[in-house]
Amino acid sequence: MRVISGKYKGKNLIGFDIDGTRPTMDRVKESLFGIIQNNIKDSIVLDLFAGSGSLGIEALSNGAKECYFFDNNIELINIIKKNTIGMDGIHVMKSDYNNALEILKKSNIKFDIIFLDPPYKLNLINDCLDKIYNYNLLNDDGIIVCEYETENINTNYFELIKDKKYGSKYIKIYKCKI
């Protein structure tokens, strides 16, 4: 696993082998970042189910100003810390997604890009989308990137702007409804 573009291009990232988790494949990441490239510069990013931090690190490599990494697994938090040594704008916290969203709500931070890549079998995206909207965590022109396999995403708050399939995985990108 590596950073595929930007300032840290070619940087090897420490991976992981933990049941129920899997990193985003390089070809999916490359396509995704080609799609969202215009949203990245000087953005504030949330990588909510961060895993190794690969998506947030890619955003930082391509010009994001800050990234907040949350994961509930201490092993993964330690991997994120190792993978981000020497990088600026890093905020890493061990927390499940519910507590993470509550913390962010209280801090009044709004994000330009939010990555949601939870363990597929848990079907957490709909709950996350509801909370992101209700807690007002997304800037008006921000986007939410969802990666999943089988979850049926149903949101009244966000508009689908891009939908791609990569093998058995889907990437959907949403923005706020106007």
What are these regions (language model features)?
Residues M1-I178:
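Class I S-adenosyl-L-methionine-dependent methyltransferase catalytic core
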